[in-house]
UniProtKB/Swiss-Prot annotation:
Gene that encodes the chain: ndhE
Family listed: Belongs to the complex I subunit 4L family.
Record InterPro entries: NADH_UbQ_OxRdtase_chain4L/K, NUOK/Mnh_C1-like
GO MF terms held by the record: oxidoreductase activity, acting on NAD(P)H, quinone or similar compound as acceptor; quinone binding
Name of the molecule in the record: NAD(P)H-quinone oxidoreductase subunit 4L, chloroplastic
GO biological process, one term: photosynthesis, light reaction
Organism field: Nandina domestica
Organism classification: Eukaryota, Viridiplantae, Streptophyta, Embryophyta, Tracheophyta
Length: 101
């Protein structure tokens, strides 16, 4: 696959993720958009690692670390959303004012 195609796809994923993160009112959807952003970053790491020096796998290893951190972030985020839903009966961002209790 050509470099430009991968970068355009990564830019689309990044822009969709940022747009969804800004406009989302649901916490689960916001977490999914954050995962899209992290996947776009991973695509860039792997692409540029292969472009500059295909013998070294620094970009691939860094992508594996980002995937592991994203998995932990998703697990913790979903646990927090589940706890908020149990207490507030809603996962909407604008309805869950956690500072007022």
């Amino acid at each position: 696959m050509m470099l430009e195609h991968v970068l355009v796809l990564s830019a689309y994923l990044l822009s969709i993720g940022i747009y969804g993160l800004i406009t989302s009112r649901n916490m689960v959807r916001a977490l999914m958009c954050l995962e899209l952003i992290l996947n776009a970053v991973n695509m860039n790491f792997v692409t540029f690692s292969d472009l500059f020096d295909s013998r070294q796998i620094k970009g691939d290893i860094f992508s594996i670390f980002v995937i592991a951190i994203a998995a932990a972030e998703a697990a913790i985020g979903l646990a927090i959303v589940s706890s908020i839903y149990r207490n507030r009966k809603s996962t909407r961002i604008n309805q869950s004012n956690l500072l007022n209790k």
